[in-house]
Each structure stands twice: as C-alpha cells, then as structure tokens.
C-alpha cells in the first residue's frame, strides 16, 4: 500500500512538474510573440497625424478641419488609441472648427515616458506638443474623464491660453477621498503581465463585434472599419508603466487642483453622462464656480461614442456665447 501511494505521489509530482514546464514554455512563447510578431503588426499602422518632439520623445498630435476656434480633445485614462477613439467626434466638430487630439505619453502612437505623471508635466506636454505642431492658443479644451483635472490645472496656470473648457464626463476635482483603491492599480499591473505574455490578446479574442458595438465602436456611430480594427490591435498594448503611474497619481492630482481657483475668464460646460449623474457632479459644479453650467446626456462614461451630434450642437452653442 505504501509503495502504491509513493508511486501515485511521484506520478502527481511529475504531472505537476510537466504542467509548470508547459506553462513556462507557453509564457516564453507568448512573451516572444508579443515583443516581435505582434509588435510589428502594431508598428505597421501609420500615425494618423503628426509626431512631434517633446522632451526628446515622440508625441502624436492629430488635427482635422479649419476654423476660427481650436478645440483640443484630451483622452481619458488608458484609452488605447485616442486618435481613433475620438475620430467620429472630431469629424463632427471639424465641420466648423479646427479640432486636435493630443495623445499623451503612454497611449496611442506616442512614446512611453519615465517622467513623473504630474499635473504640471501633463500641462507642459500638452502646450509643447501643440506648439511644436504649429497650433497656437487660445484653445477650447475638451477633456474626457481624468483629463478634466489637467485642463482645470492648465486654466488656472495659463488662463490667457484657454478660451473655454467643455468637460466630457470628467473626473470631479471636488473629491476628498481616494479616487481609485489600491486593488484597481493591482489589477492594472496584473493586466500588464497578461499583456506581456500574450494572454490579454487571447482573452480579447473572445470579445465579439457585438460587444464592441455595445461599447460604441460601430459603423453606425461614425467609426470607419480601419479605426475599429486599429483600436482592437491597440487594446493588446494598452497597459504600460506610464499609464499605471497616471492612475496611481490621480488622487494626488485631484488634491493639487481642488483648491486652485478657476479663473472667471474661463467659461466651463460640463457634459455629464446619465449613468454618472450623482452628488459628485453637484460638488464639482460648485467648485467650478458661477461661470460653469452643465448638461446631462443619456449614455455611459464614454459619452462621446454615441452622442457626437448632441455634443457638437452643445459645442456650437457654447462657442456662440463666447463670441
């Protein structure tokens, strides 16, 4: 009986050893593919706009349309390819305006960076990239989500460069508690590891076109098939240390901005997604002051995916008041 148990134990240990070796081999293969073949697929996609030098690294600036006003779209956290993500909104807004998307370091076609992800650095990178692309202020900033923090900071530091701000379901800078718990940061770090061994690619391969459409990525919402395909490819490369640090610094960024007075010369329109219309928005509007107004649109946090026409009309009305 003892010999039998000993034999069974050895077989189990051998099986476990084989499984571990198999998993290690799979991870090594996945890591190699991620760094070579899959990366070459990504690099085959040409930037939609212009690459400019910022702090000796490349940043992507995508411009469309002409007009008296320049609208600058700034992406939310971790959006894989903002230039494609914002494309339907850009096409709608560019009918009467110059519209620009700035891709931060760590997303889209832009390089990654080790430079601290602070409000000051984001502001300087936005200003420098636009200047290098020959796009001069003043601007109407149109930030989504976390970029609202950087836009408010920008307006307090250089109000002469900011003609107005249209917030797309932006992060509230009136928050007093931590925005993201530590377990979310840990989840991002785990996702980065999954990405590096190509597991993320495997998991994303199960996402159907119907699921993408439900999240707003559809021809009916104004996307081209190329934009949808490019976004899907970039989803496999969306996790990196630059955006993880951005997430980790969110609370610090909010705390730095929340006590800075918004200049009275900068009007603000806050567009709120119906799913996020709660007390946080009221607190935020109080902080923004008397020169701020709000509109609630039906939709999710990525409100610009399916409300491009309404956002465009609200933008026209906002600009009419500026003039």
Model-derived features: where do they sit?
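Alpha/beta-hydrolase fold catalytic core
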Residues: 2-71, 95-97, 136, 320-323
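Conserved HGGG/HGGXW glycine-rich cap/lid loop of the alpha/beta-hydrolase fold
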Residues: 57-109
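Active-site loop/oxyanion-hole signature of alpha/beta-hydrolase fold enzymes
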Residues: 104-142
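Conserved hydrolase catalytic core segment
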Residues: 137-180
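Catalytic histidine-centered segment of alpha/beta-hydrolase-like enzymes
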Residues: 299-309
